Amino acid sequence: MSDKKTHKLVTDEYYVRPQAAWEKMKAARSMRQTVYLYGTTGSGKTTFVMDFLGRRRCCYASVADTGIDEIAGMMPEKSETYTIFVIDDLHLLETEDDRSACGHLIEKMSARTDVWLILISRAPMPKWLKTAFVRYIFVTIGEEELCLSQKEQEQYLEKWELMPTAVTVRRIWELGQGNP
């Protein structure tokens, strides 16, 4: 096994947790159910995962800079304790061979009781991952669940010490719909 990329993820003091996504993550964690998060660039996918994991150690790999073979080499040995494993940027897998290899690896990891797998992508569930999704019943969190509620948006503005008028707050909501 190659050297693991183990990260202690840190949180942002200005971050406001989207409760809809938070509740789904808590349920998935309690059952160690694979999670598939997706959303457009800037929708807060990776930040949300970092905040949720807090100071917990995890193995993190982005397919942007880590090959599938290297990610497979990072997979921990079976253990009494569980490992949190995050694979980011799945949308960057371009070749059929990479997608197939990654799909196989995800199936292996999802089947293990000592691994909690979190997958992050810009795209909804891709066709090449549907078999694993059905077999292992992934929890899916889409970008709409990463959006803030009106109350959460107001908390965000307060953290930045911004005090817009009620009219401005409504306008911000109309324009952004809670997009982080």
Place the predicted regions along the sequence by residue:
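Walker A/P-loop nucleotide-binding motif
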Residues: 31-49
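Amphipathic alpha-helical "lid/sensor" segments that cap RecA-like P-loop NTPase cores
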Residues: 42, 47-48, 140, 158-180
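Conserved catalytic segments around the Walker B and adjacent sensor/switch elements
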Residues: 54-68
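Conserved P-loop NTPase "ATPase switch" module shared by AAA+ and STAND
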Residues: 77-102
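Sensor-1/coupling segment of RecA-like P-loop NTPase cores
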Residues: 92, 105-132
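Conserved AAA+ ATPase "sensor/coupling" helix adjacent to the nucleotide-binding pocket
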Residues: 135, 152-163
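Conserved AAA+ ATPase "SRH/arginine-finger" region at the nucleotide-binding site
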Residues: 139-150
